[in-house]
Curated annotation (Swiss-Prot):
Subunit structure: Heterotrimer composed of an alpha, a beta and a gamma chain.
Keyword RNA-binding: yes
The keyword Protein biosynthesis is assigned to this record: yes
Origin: domain of life: Archaea
Family: Belongs to the eIF-2-alpha family.
Protein known as: Translation initiation factor 2 subunit alpha
UniProt keyword annotations, A-Z: Initiation factor, Protein biosynthesis, RNA-binding
Molecular function GO terms recorded: ribosome binding; RNA binding; translation initiation factor activity
Domain S1 motif per the UniProt entry, residue ranges: 10-81
């Protein structure tokens, strides 16, 4: 869902090439219905471009940077050479996510028995303003526990969250570090095992032996902040047990 009629200078946009000429190419902006773009041959690639068709063809989708906007004609000037591969991959992924979000939004509207334009004005536009993209709003709803977005009201919220949880998979993030554990006691091995035994209800925690005296810990969660909190809690538990059992422990975050 796009709430702007035109992109701004500097924006990255997904362009479908419609016509390739000797000195440039025309295309339509996938995220901006009715808006066309033009890539001059000098903005196709760095260096001299002998054959433009070596770089562009009809039907091809490319990511370009907006370098000029004509609001009256709804035409923008574009540059292909000013976009690197990393930016291009990220933009294509973002665009595909927004396509998915638009389809999910239509499902939300259908369950509410309202048309998409009505829903867009009631809450869609505001969600994009708050989260930056519609997909980000669905991600937020999918991760919610309890009331989601208390600053907004409406019967649409429960349906939106329901659709989000049914269709959005939140990838896990991980944080890690290393414990160095020492004990000179006769039963030191058993003490170290006890120190490094983490309660199962702490979270998704993996502990692996690297080589004496090092152990690697990895904490996984769908929320980075929560993963950090779990890791901090584990370190606290280990330190408390180590002190009680007279085991030396040093922790270094990776």
């Amino acid at each position: 869902m796009n709430i702007k009629p035109l992109p701004d200078n500097g924006d990255l946009v997904v362009v479908k090439i419609t016509e390739v000429k000797n000195f440039g190419a025309n295309g339509v902006l996938e995220e901006y219905p009715g808006v066309e773009g033009y890539i001059h041959i000098s903005e196709v690639a760095t260096g001299w471009v002998k054959h433009i068709r070596s770089y562009l063809r009809e039907g091809q989708r490319v990511v370009c940077k907006v370098i000029g906007v004509n609001p009256e004609r709804k035409v923008v000037d574009l540059s292909l050479k000013r976009v690197n591969q990393h930016q291009s991959r990220e933009k294509i992924a973002e665009w595909k996510n927004e396509q998915k979000a638009d389809k999910l939004f239509e499902i939300v509207c259908s369950r509410l028995n309202r048309n998409p334009e009505e829903c867009k004005e009631q809450f869609g536009r505001r969600l994009v303003e708050l989260f930056g993209t519609l997909f980000a709003a669905f991600e937020s709803a999918a991760q919610s526990n309890g009331e989601w977005l208390p600053e907004m009201n409406g019967d649409w919220k429960n349906v939106f969250v329901e659709i989000a949880k049914e269709n959005i998979t939140i990838p896990e993030v991980s944080v890690s570090g290393y414990f160095e554990v020492y004990s000179l006691a006769s039963d030191g091995v058993e003490r170290i095992k006890e120190v490094l035994t983490i309660p199962e209800d702490t979270g998704k925690v993996e502990l692996e032996y690297v080589g004496a005296p090092r152990y690697r810990i990895v904490v996984k969660d769908k929320d980075y902040k929560k993963a950090e909190e779990i890791l901090k809690k584990v370190v606290q538990i280990v330190n408390e047990k180590a002190k009680k059992l007279q085991v030396e422990v040093e922790f270094n975050k990776q």
